[in-house]
Amino acid sequence: MKKSFPTLLATLVWSALYSQHALADLAEQCMLGVPTYNRPLVTGDPNQLPVNIQADKTEANYPDNAKFIGNVNIQQGNSIMTAEQVELSQLDPATQGSTPTRTITATGKVHYDDNQVILKGPKAWANLNTKDTDVYEGDYQMVGRQGRGSADKMKMRDSNRYTILENGSFTSCLPGDNSWSVVGSEVIQDREEQVAEIWNARFKIGGVPVFYSPYLQLPIGDKRRSGFLIPNAKYGSSNGFELLTPYYWNIAPNFDATITPHLQTKRGMQWQNEFRYLTTPGLGVIQFDWLPSDSEYAKTSQQDNNDTRWLLHWGHSGVMDQVWRFDADYTKVSDDRYFTDLDSHYGSTTDGYVTQKLSTGYANQNWNTTLSTRQFQVFSNATSRDVYRAEPQLDINYYQNDIGPVDMHLYGQAVKFTNVNDNRPEATRLHVEPTLNLPLANRWASLNTEAKLLATHYQQDNLDRYRADPTVSDVNKNALQSSVNRVMPQYKVDGKMVFEREMDWSQAYTQTLEPRAQYLYVPYRDQSSIHTYDSTLMQTDYSGLFRDRSYSGLDRIASANQIATGVTTRIYDDALVERFNASIGQIYYFDRPRTGDRNTSLDKSDNNGSQVWAGDSFLKIDDSWGVRGGLQYDNRLNEVALGDAVLEYRRDAERLVQLNYRYASPEYIRDMLPNVTNQGSQQGISQVGVTASWPIVERWAVVGAYYYDTKANQPANQLIGLQYNTCCWAVSVGYERKITDWNSASRSSEYDNKVSFNIELRGLSSNYGLGSDKMLRSGILPYQRAF
C-alpha cells in the first residue's frame, strides 16, 4: 500500500498533464440547458401597460367577454401567453372609476413565459390586473437559473414572486435528467427570499424515495436562508464513522449561526456551534464545540480522568469612530490532544499551541496605545510546561516627524508576566525606547541613520521557589535578581540603492539592481540576571538579515557590532509584473553577539567574521509556471540551517501541480526549539512533497498530496480525493493518512487513516467549482499557493 500510493498519484497527474481534451467551463455547460429571457425588458406599472392579442378567429360580446380561437398570442409587458383558445372576460368594478377586472381562461397547449418563469399545461387561468396565474397539470422552468418541475396545479402570485405547486415537484437538474427531485403536497417558491418551502416532502434519487420530512426548505439562490445544509460523512481509524448534519440559522441580516451535530461512532456525539455577527464595533465569530463524553479518549488518556472535550474560539476585529480598535484571537481547548483527535478550523496538531489574546486600542494622528492580555495554551507534558502570560500589557507609540531634519518615535511598554507553573519567576517589566531617525532619499537611493536608547526595568518575584525547584536546568537561576535595570544605546545606518536598466534582449523588460548595507551597533550588557519571559531566537531569512534584533521580545537584546550586506535583482515585464527576483546577503560580525545568557546557543559561539548567509529567489516563468526557493547557511553550525523550494504549475484553481521540499537541520531545531521533546522532530526535517489537482476526464477531478520524510524514511502525509460533478449534484470521496503523534515506546510515528464521503446538490446557487481547492486545504499539510 505504501509503495502503490505515490505510483497511483504520479500516474493520475501524468495522464492529466498530457490529456489532449480541454474541459469546457461547467457553469457554461449547465447554463446551456437553462432558458434565458432575450426580449427587451419592459418596465413600469403592469396594470397600465396595454394588452395585445392576436388570433386566427375572434368572437366578442363587448364589453363583457371575447373569445379568441386558433394560434392565440397574448402579450402584456414582459408576459406572453399562447394557446389554442382563450376567453377574455371583463368585470366592471363595483366602485365607479376603478379599473375593470380582466381575466383570461386558456385551453389547449397553453404556454406562459416572462422574465422569471416558463409554464406549460393543457389549461390556464390568469388575472391580467394582478398577474395571478394558474396552470393545471403542467410543467414549469425557471428563467436564467436552474430549477424546474411539475404539478397538478401551478399558481403564480404577488406579481410572480411566488410559485405555488399543488402535488408538485422540484429539481435543479436540467431537462431530461431526473437524478434527484423533491416532491410535496404543496411547494412554495419565493423568488425574493430565494427559498422553496415543501410540505410532506419526499426526496427522490432517480425516482426512488429515500427520505421523508413533513416540512423542508431548499435554497434556490445565493441569499442566506435558515435550513439544513448538505450532510457530510467520513470514516477514520481514530473516530470511526462520522456524520455531520449542519443546520444554518439566519437570525438577522447581521447575525447567523451554524449548529452541527457531529456523530463519531468511536467517540460519541459532538455539537459544533458557530455564531457570526456584524455590529458597529466590528465583526467576529464565536465557535463552541462540545463533546460531553469521549469514550475513545477515556480509554487512551492516562493523565486526565475527565472525558469531556470542548473548544472555545472567539475571533473579532473592528474599528469604531475611526479611532478605537477592538481585536480578539482567543482559542482554548479542553486538553493537549484535542487537535490530534478532533478536526477543527481553529487549530492543528502541528501548531503546538493556541493563543488567547484580547486587545483594545486608540489611535490618533501622532500617537496610539494598545491595552492587551495574552496567554498561550501549549500542548506538552504537564511537567515540562513553562508558559508565560502577559496580563496585562500596555503599549504606547508617539510619533513626531519633521523636527528639523529628523523624525522622532517614542515607544513605551508596561507588562505583567505570570506563569502557568507556580515555581517559575514572575515579573513586571517597564520599557522606554526613544528613537531619532534622519532619513535621506532621492529617486535612486536612501540613507537612514537611526539612534535609540533602550531603557528597561524588571521587578522579578518568586525567585527562591524557582532556584529550589530540582527540575530546573537553567544555569542562570542563581544569577537572577529581584530588581534589574538595563540601559542600552543602539546605533544603525541603513543604506539602499536602486539601479534600473532595460534588458538587452528585450526592451519590454526592466531589470533592477538593489544593493543594501546596514551597520548596527549595540553595546554588550550582561543579561543573565534577567529571566526570559517573551524572548526567543528568530530565524534569519534574507529580510531578517537587516533586523535590529536577534531575539523577539525585550528580555534578550544581543550586543551587535556588525554589518549586513545584500543585493536584490528584479525583472519586470512591460505591465510592471515582477517576473523574477533573487536576493543574497550576509552578516559580518566584528564582535560576536552576546547576551550573557549561558543557556542560549548565540552566546556559545566564539566566532567573528561572516557567520550567517541567506538568500531567496522567485521566477514567474509565465502566467502558469512559477518557482520559489530560499536558503539559510549558518557558519556557527557549519551547515545549512533552513531551506525550501517550490515548483508549481497552475493553470487555474482546479488545475495545478506543485512540487516542494523543505529542510531544517537538527542543530537548528535544537537551538530554536530547545524544549521540543518529540524525537521525531529533534532529528531534523527533510520532507519532499507533491500536490496536484486536475480534471482528468469530463466532470471528474482528482486531487492528491504526498509528503515523504527522508530523515525518518516514512510518509508524513498522504491525501487523495476524487470528485464527480454534474449540473445538479456532485459526489467526492477522499482518503488521508497523517501523523498524529509520536510513540516513545516504539520510537515511531502514529498514524490516523481517514476515508471521507460527501454528496452535494448543485444548481441551487451560483457555485459550480469542482471542489478541488477545498479538498487540498483539508490536509494536515494544506496546499499553499506559490505565486
Swiss-Prot record:
Compartments it resides in: Cell outer membrane
Pfam families in the record: LptD (PF04453), LptD_N (PF03968)
Keywords (A to Z) from UniProt: Cell outer membrane, Membrane, Signal
GO biological process: Gram-negative-bacterium-type cell outer membrane assembly; lipopolysaccharide transport
Main subcellular location: membrane
Signal peptide: 1-24
Disulfide bond entries: none
Keyword Signal: yes
A cellular component annotation (GO) from this entry: cell outer membrane
Role noted for this protein: Together with LptE, is involved in the assembly of lipopolysaccharide (LPS) at the surface of the outer membrane.
Similarity-based family: Belongs to the LptD family.
NCBIfam families: PRK03761.1 (NF002997)
Subunit structure, as described in the record: Component of the lipopolysaccharide transport and assembly complex. Interacts with LptE and LptA.
UniProt protein name: LPS-assembly protein LptD
Source organism of the structure: Pectobacterium atrosepticum (strain SCRI 1043 / ATCC BAA-672) (Erwinia carotovora subsp. atroseptica)
